[in-house]
Amino acid sequence: MGKPRGLRTARKHRSHRRDQRWHDKDYKKAHLGTRWKANPFGGASHAKGIVLEKVGVEAKQPNSAIRKCVRVQLIKNGKKITAFVPRDGCLNYIEENDEVLVAGFGRKGHAVGDIPGVRFKVVKVANVSLLALYKEKKERPRS
């Protein structure tokens, strides 16, 4: 049997479309409300947090490296996440108990590249851009 055709089939078409929408991954993600439940940021693009410790995450095969990351406890809800520290030597600008600004890391909530389970990256440290510290345009504020 094909789809219903002809007059007076609009209700059937509409309800079928409504049912089939739930099989679309993006529609489901947008309408189920899991953005607020499952996402540590709670639907926001960035979040501030306190650095708990520095960690090295081993890259997935076939690469062999230790990617420099930090464990961060978010201020808004207390959830703990692992955030990647981009660029060479930038881990030296971050100390424990620093306040950092964390953003998403590409791929809409999925891990990126060869770093397993890391979905976030550090953008600012102590309200100073990590890129500015790296390029030596700014210095860390004295604490």
Swiss-Prot record:
Keywords carried by this UniProt record: Cytoplasm, Endoplasmic reticulum, Hydroxylation, Ribonucleoprotein, Ribosomal protein
Disulfide-bond pairs as recorded: none
A Pfam family the protein falls into: Ribosom_S12_S23
Stretches assigned to coiled coil: none
An MF annotation (GO) of this entry: structural constituent of ribosome
Region annotation (Disordered) ranges: 1-26
Gene Ontology annotations for the cellular component aspect, listed alphabetically: cytosolic small ribosomal subunit; rough endoplasmic reticulum
CDD domains with a match to the protein in the record: Ribosomal_S23
Compositionally biased spans, kind Basic residues: 1-20
Main location (coarse class): cytoplasm
Entries under InterPro entries matching the protein: NA-bd_OB-fold (IPR012340), Ribosomal_uS12 (IPR006032), Ribosomal_uS12_euk/arc (IPR005680)
Modified residues (Hydroxyproline): P62
Subcellular location: Cytoplasm, Cytosol; Cytoplasm; Rough endoplasmic reticulum
Keyword Disulfide bond annotated: no
Biological processes per GO annotation: cytoplasmic translation
Subunit structure and binding partners: Component of the 40S small ribosomal subunit.
Family: Belongs to the universal ribosomal protein uS12 family.
Descriptive protein name: Small ribosomal subunit protein uS12
Organism whose genome encodes this protein: Dermacentor variabilis (American dog tick)
